[in-house]
Structure formats: C-alpha cells, structure tokens
C-alpha cells in the first residue's frame, strides 16, 4: 500500500528525470534482449554442444575406470587386513564391546559337515547379484533382530530402503516376508508372505512396527541365546512351508556383535547344523552386521559363524559389512533374469571399451547436434506459419489477394471500433468477429501479436514513459504494479477525443500513472493472458468509476499496461488503516494523529460508486468474477474505481462456465461454487460481500469457515452477519444479494437506485436521509441495528413545517420543481455533468409519483366525505 506523501512532485515545466534514467525503457541496457533468431547464435550453440559432449566423455571414462577397478578386485578372502575394501573406506566403529568371559574362540573350528560348496559353475545355484534365466522367481525372507533400542529408528528405515533397492527387478510372481523376534504368535510371520508390488505388501511396510524387531528384555543379557531361538523359529518356518520358487535368500539384519553370539554356548553348538539345514532347504544366507566394521576381526567372525565367508558373495553364507552395501547394491540384487552377471563383469576388455568411446562419443555428439538443428528448424517453421496466417503482422509489400483481403478486414474492423468508441456506441461489440485477432488465441505467436499492436493508437513510446521500479505499488502472483510518469498526451484522450476528463495527477503535461508489468518468472501463457487483458482494457471504454487504461506498451518480452494512478491505493487497506477513525456523530472530532476521518455517509458513497461502475460493466455484458475490496482503488478525492480485470470475461450468453484457475472462493455465489457458472448475478453476490467489507472496515468474510466448506455452509443457509457500523437499509441490500436463486437477486442499476435514495445530498449529519415516499413527503432515516431513537432532517430543497399531527409537510406541488432545480445544481457540483442526468431523473420520478399518490389519496378522502 502506498501513501499520498510518496507522490513524485513535478515543480518545473521541464523536470529533470536524470535520476530515473535506469528505469527508462529506451535505456540501451534495458533495450538489449536476446535475439529471436535461433540461427544468429550458432557459435554459442556449438560451444554448448561441444562442452556437453566433453562432459559425457569424462563421465563415461570415469565410470568405466571405476568399474574396471572393481572388477580387478577379485573375490574377498578372510586373510585381507586392509582398512579399505573395493575403494570404500569403513567409518563405523569396530565393535560395541570387548570380548566377554564366556567367549572362547577355537581357531581350529571346522565348517559343518555336508555343507554345499560353490563349484564355480553358475548353473549350480542361484546367487544374489548374478543374472540367470533359471532364477526368475525368488522368496526373500528378511529377518530383523536388534539389540539396541536407541538405534531402532535409524536402522529400520535403512533396512527397508536396502530391501527395496535389491528387489527392484522382482515381479509379482516373487514373494517376500519379514520375521521379527517379537511376533504376535509363533507362526504369524511364517504365514505372512506377500507378492511383490502388491497392496498387501505396501500395507505391511506402512504398518511396520519397529518395536517388534527388538529382542525381549528377558534376553537382554543373553543376546546370543536370543539369536539361537530366532534362527530356530526361522528353521521351523522353512520346514513348514518350504521354498516353492526358483530360489530363496535369507537376509539376517542385526546390531549384535560376534562376541554376543560367541558368549552363547547353545548358539555356538547349534549354528553349524542350523545353517546346513537352511542351505539344504534352498536358501542362501547373508548376515548383515549393522553399524560395525569387521575388517580387522573377520577371522573371528568366520570362526563364530562357521561355514560363512566374510564379504564373499560367491558363497552360500556371506558375512556383510553394512557400510559396503550402499556403495555396491548390484552385488545383493535378486530376480535378475538375464544370463550376464550384473555385479561383476567377467573378462572385462578395456580395449573394446576404448574403441566404443572413440566411435560412440562422436556419434552421440552428432546426434545431439542434429536434434538441436531439427528443433531450431521446427520453431522457425512454426513462427513463419503463424506470420503467414496473420499476414497483417508482415511488412512485406508483395502479398497475394487472400492476404490483402484479410488485412483489409483487420484495418476496417479496427477503424470501425475506434469510430464507435469515439461516438460512444460500441455496446454491440461482437467478440466472435475478433476471434482470430484476439490475443487469447492459442495459435498466435507473442512476437506477431506485439508487432500487430506497435502502430496501434493505444501505444506509448517508451521515450515518454518512466517506470520507478523502486516504488512498488502492489504485487500479485502474475503481475507487479509500479508507479510511473507519462509525458505528453495520453492515448486515452486521443482515442476518446470528446472525453472531458480531469486527471488528478496531471502536472504540466506529465501524468502520474500506475504501470503493470509481468514478473521475471512469467511464462508464455502469462504473456498471452497479459495481452488479453490489454485487448480487454481497450474495449472497455471510459467510465468515472471503472479504472481506465491510459495506454500500453506491446513489447513481446516486457509488455506494460499503463492505468490511472489512484493515490489512496486499494479499498481494503484503506478501510483497515482507518478502522479506528470512523465518526459516528456529527459532533465527533477527528483525532490529530489521523490523516483523515470517515463518516457513514462516506462509506455509503463508496458503495454507490462501486455499484455505478459495476452497472456499467453489466451494460457492456462483462462479468468481473473477482469483485472485492482489494480490487477497488481510491483516488485522492475518494473516488472509487473498479479494477483488476484479470478474471473478467465477455458474456456472449446467459452464463459463462469457467474451465479452471484460481478463483475467490469466499466471494463466490452458490452456483459459482457448485457448477463454476458465472453471470452478472454472481457479481451481485460478490457485491454483497463487498458491502460487508466496507461497513466492517475491512474484516475478512467468513473467518471461521474453511474454503473447502464454503459451499456446504452456504447451502445450509449460512450468511454473513450485519456489521456494527452497517445501517439496516444497507444490510437489507446485502441480504438480497445473497439470495440462493440468481433470479431473486437485484440488478446493479436497481441497487444503485436504492443507494442513491439513501445518500444525503444536502445534510452532512450522520444517519439521516431526506427522501420522498409514495404516501407523501415523509422523512426517513438510516437506522443502525442497535439504535432506538431517531431524529428527522430536512429534505433537499424548500422548507418544511411541522403540522399539528407531528408530521412534516413538504409544501405544494410547485415545491417538487424547486427540489429538482436545487437537486440539479447539487448534482452538477458533486458528480459532474455525466452522472447528473441519471441521478436527477431518479429523484424527479420519485417526487412526481409521490405527489400523484397524494392527490389520489386526497381525492379519495373528499369523495368518501361527500358520500
């Protein structure tokens, strides 16, 4: 919100604008923009493509070198003592505790009897990370047993993520199951196996209970025995169900140390036999020790887990460091149907790869260049086709007869439109005739549209326009409004040469203006909508209570709309700023700190002006769709002007149906919320909400109702309550506006007439109006919702005397003529010649009807008396 004191003052006839040079649109720095020719920057395009190709080469070489390094690492053995493995540096702590008293490691501990040995032939077994056509369907059993509750929250999500990564290739024919030490029943986990990619699996993962993964508190001091019972449970499950698919893998995730396992004699004695049975059942087993580095203690770990190999993926039981899996997920992947191994490439041939690099990179670069060239040609072809369709945008003098005919139609319709605007007779404007010239057409190019408007009479030369980008008047989602100055005669007065308009902000041929422009992030659709708004403002015409466009700049990259400057900003902020400065009585004094104070009469006057502006829009068959206090602007003299026509549409039928977009929910009627149907009657509903905003001094409508509940609230009969400062007569109009059926709502010209009657044109006292009624010259008043006592006031024109009955007499019939004469003078001084006639006609008709009614009543009384 801007303040009147911030207005730029121009004292001299030729003011200096040197301090605003950076805001000029004719500034060379701002005029420079990227060339529209896609072939003008061939060198730059080629440099970009060359750099892109170079990046691809570097990345490819790095990836290949990394893969070669991994392939030459070979199988890991238990004798490796290095602190790194496969290029991965381990950062986890070695163990959580030192060896206990009950742990005795026997270096001569042998592997279990009859344990299968991998022979090197890939057809003998289904292993993780190996592609095989015989290993398409898998049963993945994930056993999670954790000891430390502090790490459960971090360990469980990482386990789920690992399982997801290693089973991406599994189809719905493969199955997965989870097993925990604390299950609801002994066989519950065993009976729950889920197909991959099923809703049941998704629900199971969503309902994953971390607490089930912890060992029982009774096993807190004997974690090795807990592992024994857990493996026994898994083995019983295997004996019960078996593996009916091509292969099976058992992933055991634990944060126990090998020392915890070693301290349990039961585990140490039973593990070899348990492992042998699991392998004979068709499982390959992998132990994942979470948050541990077993590099330095791999011999001890292999001794505890007899038959398992440390970091050897080609064994039936593998001991895995948890830190290694994230760097090499392919080595643990299952359900790979091809015959080629994915984890480690056999017989890697660097010379073949080098040859592929030499041949492939140039081919890829050439392909990219061809695609870029094709895209450039396609865009240029589309641009030429658009310009051929709209031949009026071409400066070529050699045109065929069809092109000349289309150009003549364009020029003829433009001249007719300008002539109708000058004569004020453009009410019957048919937008369908302008359909292939309108800026909202999707096929029109923005550049061509801008070229069409360059020689338009509404255009402002950028040399005569200064934009103060450091003086932001307002901003929204799709546009920013800045203060600016227009030099010379404004296009609005050129188009409407008969318009005798006085601009408040004019000073020696320089006009203060509000300049609307698109933000930097605006896309092509925003530009098209902006040009649509420019076209709408041209067709809108001039009205004292509707914001007028002074001119425009049809720059395709930075179009501008120049409108009237309203010093007091939007009505909503104005009301909230003066919320505490409303004088309820004539004798009240305005506080010293207030820049101005308002009376109820001022609020009624603003409401009348908005109704007048909306009546004009309705007469032009325009629907606003966003009538609210935030979109009403106030000039320095408190003249209200309807603005913001971004959602405004031309109504060529009884209803306009919206197709989407952002809409003001709490200002919308029932049919607009329910069916997205808009008409003048929906604007009437919004006008009722606007009246609530005015007389509540800027309160938010329906503050306790959510937007999604608005339709239900309105259908249930919910409406806004009467504001404290709202007269009963105004609230009656508001209630009429909120009728559920559109046909029951009043027209804007009807409401304008009612508010005209309410306006006190002769008395500045608060709350009292002088009007004529059908029953004779009586005195009515604006009554507040909590007022009990009222007082009369004088009627415009003439003097009144109180008769014996306490009624006011307005005099003879000749007094009506005196009233209209005085009313004529007051209207001319207050509202100008343009609005005088309509208001005068309303008052005179009311006076004439009341006098005729009085005569009929008098004659009827005399006849009754005589009879």
Curated annotation (Swiss-Prot):
Q: Where in the cell is it found?
A: Membrane
Which EC class is this protein assigned? Answer: transferase
Q: Which residues form the active site?
A: 626
Q: Which GO terms describe its biological process?
A: cell surface receptor protein tyrosine kinase signaling pathway
Residue positions annotated to bind ATP are: 473-481, 516
The GO terms this record gives for MF are: ATP binding; transmembrane receptor protein tyrosine kinase activity
Q: Where is the composition biased (Acidic residues)?
A: 801-810
Among InterPro entries, the record links this protein to: Kinase-like_dom_sf (IPR011009), Prot_kinase_dom (IPR000719), RTK (IPR050122), Ser-Thr/Tyr_kinase_cat_dom (IPR001245), Tyr_kinase_AS (IPR008266), Tyr_kinase_cat_dom (IPR020635)
- Entry-linked PROSITE patterns: PROTEIN_KINASE_DOM, PROTEIN_KINASE_TYR
Q: Where is the composition biased (Polar residues)?
A: 858-867
Family according to the record: Belongs to the protein kinase superfamily. Tyr protein kinase family.
Glycosylation sites noted in the Swiss-Prot or TrEMBL record = 395, 423, 496, 500, 585, 859
Question: How is this protein named in the record?
Answer: Putative tyrosine-protein kinase F09A5.2
Query: What keywords are assigned to this protein?
Result: ATP-binding, Glycoprotein, Kinase, Membrane, Nucleotide-binding, Receptor, Transferase, Transmembrane, Transmembrane helix, Tyrosine-protein kinase
The chemistry this enzyme catalyses reads:
L-tyrosyl-[protein] + ATP = O-phospho-L-tyrosyl-[protein] + ADP + H(+)
Is the keyword Nucleotide-binding assigned to this protein?
yes
Residue ranges crossing the lipid bilayer per the database entry: 45-65, 355-375
Q: Where is this region: Disordered?
A: 782-821, 848-867
Q: Give the species.
A: Caenorhabditis elegans
Where the record annotates domain Protein kinase, the positions are: 467-757
The Gene Ontology CC terms held by the record are: plasma membrane; receptor complex
EC number of this enzyme: 2.7.10.1
């Amino acid at each position: 919100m801007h303040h009147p004191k911030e207005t730029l003052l121009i004292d001299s006839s030729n003011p200096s604008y040197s301090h605003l040079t950076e805001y000029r649109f004719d500034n060379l720095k701002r005029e420079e923009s990227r060339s529209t020719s896609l072939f003008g920057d061939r060198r730059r395009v080629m440099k970009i493509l060359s750099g892109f190709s170079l990046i691809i080469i570097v990345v490819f070489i790095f990836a290949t070198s990394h893969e070669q390094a991994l392939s030459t690492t070979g199988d890991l053995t238990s004798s490796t003592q290095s602190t790194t493995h496969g290029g991965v540096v381990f950062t986890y702590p070695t163990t959580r505790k030192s060896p206990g008293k009950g742990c005795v490691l026997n270096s001569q501990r042998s592997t279990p009897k009859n344990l299968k040995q991998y022979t090197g032939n890939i057809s003998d077994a289904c292993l993780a990370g190996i592609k095989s056509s015989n290993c398409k369907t898998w049963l993945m059993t994930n056993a999670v047993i954790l000891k430390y509750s502090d790490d459960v929250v971090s360990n469980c999500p990482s386990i789920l993520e690992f399982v997801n990564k290693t089973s991406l290739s599994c189809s719905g024919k493969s199955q997965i199951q989870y097993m925990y030490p604390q299950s609801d029943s002994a066989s519950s986990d065993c009976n729950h196996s889920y197909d991959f990619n099923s809703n049941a699996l998704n629900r199971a993962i969503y309902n994953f209970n971390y607490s089930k993964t912890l060992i029982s508190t009774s096993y807190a001091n004997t974690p090795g025995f807990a592992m024994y019972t857990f493996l026994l449970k898994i083995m019983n499950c295997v004996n019960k169900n078996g593996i009916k698919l091509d292969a099976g893998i058992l992933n055991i995730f634990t944060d126990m140390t090998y020392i915890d396992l070693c301290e349990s004699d039961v585990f140490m004695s039973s593990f070899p036999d348990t492992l042998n049975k699991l392998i004979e059942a068709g499982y390959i087993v992998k132990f994942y020790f979470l948050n541990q580095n077993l590099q330095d203690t791999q011999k001890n770990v292999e001794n505890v887990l007899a038959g398992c190999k440390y970091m050897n993926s080609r064994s039936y039981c593998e001991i895995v460091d948890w830190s290694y899996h994230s760097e090499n997920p392919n080595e643990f992947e299952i359900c790979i149907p091809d015959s080629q191994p994915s984890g480690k490439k056999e017989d890697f041939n660097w010379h073949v790869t080098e040859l592929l690099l030499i041949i492939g990179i140039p081919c890829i670069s050439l392909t990219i260049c061809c695609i870029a060239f094709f895209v450039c040609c396609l865009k240029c072809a589309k641009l030429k086709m658009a310009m051929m369709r709209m031949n009026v945008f071409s400066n070529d003098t050699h045109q065929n007869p069809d092109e000349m005919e289309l150009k003549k139609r364009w020029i003829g319709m433009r001249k007719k439109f300008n002539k109708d605007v000058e004569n004020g007779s453009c009410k019957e404007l048919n937008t369908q005739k302008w359909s292939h010239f309108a800026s909202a057409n999707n096929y029109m190019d923005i550049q061509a549209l801008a070229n069409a408007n360059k020689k338009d009479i509404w255009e402002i030369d950028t040399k005569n326009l200064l934009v103060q980008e450091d003086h932001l008047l307002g901003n929204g989602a799709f546009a920013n409004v800045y203060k600016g100055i227009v030099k010379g005669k404004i296009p609005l007065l050129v188009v409407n040469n008969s318009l005798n308009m006085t601009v408040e902000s004019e000073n020696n041929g320089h006009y203060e203006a509000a300049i609307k422009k698109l933000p930097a992030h605006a896309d092509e659709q925003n530009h098209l909508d902006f040009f649509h708004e420019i076209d709408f403002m041209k067709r809108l015409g001039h009205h004292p209570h509707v914001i007028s466009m002074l001119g425009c700049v049809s720059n395709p990259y930075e179009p501008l709309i120049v409108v009237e400057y309203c010093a007091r900003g939007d009505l909503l902020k104005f009301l909230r700023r003066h919320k505490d400065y409303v004088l309820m009585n004539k004798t009240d004094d305005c506080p010293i700190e207030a820049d101005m104070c308002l009376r109820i009469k001022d609020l009624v006057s603003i409401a009348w002006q908005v109704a007048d502006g909306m009546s004009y829009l309705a007469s032009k068959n325009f629907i606003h769709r966003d009538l609210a206090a935030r979109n009403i602007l106030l000039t320095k003299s408190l003249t209200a002007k309807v603005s913001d026509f971004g959602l405004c549409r031309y109504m060529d039928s009884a209803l306009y149906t919206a197709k989407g977009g952002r809409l003001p929910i709490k200002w919308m009627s029932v049919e607009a919320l329910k069916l997205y149907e808009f008409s003048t009657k929906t604007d009437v509903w919004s006008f009722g909400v606007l009246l609530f905003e005015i007389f509540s001094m800027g309160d938010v409508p329906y503050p306790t109702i959510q937007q999604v509940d608005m339709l239900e609230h309105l259908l249930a009969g919910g409406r806004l309550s009467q504001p404290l400062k709202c007269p009963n007569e105004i609230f009656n109009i508001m209630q009429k506006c909120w009728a559920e059926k559109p046909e029951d709502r009043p027209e804007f010209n009807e409401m304008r007439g009612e508010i005209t009657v309410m306006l006190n044109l002769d008395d500045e006292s608060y709350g009292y109006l002088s009007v004529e009624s059908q029953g004779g010259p009586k005195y009515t008043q604006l009554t507040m919702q909590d007022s009990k006592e009222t007082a009369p006031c004088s009627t415009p024109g003439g003097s009144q005397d109180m008769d014996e009955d306490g009624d006011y007499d307005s005099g003879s019939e000749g007094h009506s003529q005196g009233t209209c004469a005085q009313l004529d003078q007051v209207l001319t001084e207050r509202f100008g010649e343009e609005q005088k006639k309509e208001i005068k006609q309303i008052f005179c008709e009311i006076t004439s009807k009341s006098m005729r009614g009085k005569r009929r009543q008098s004659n009827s009384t005399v006849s009754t008396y005589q009879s």
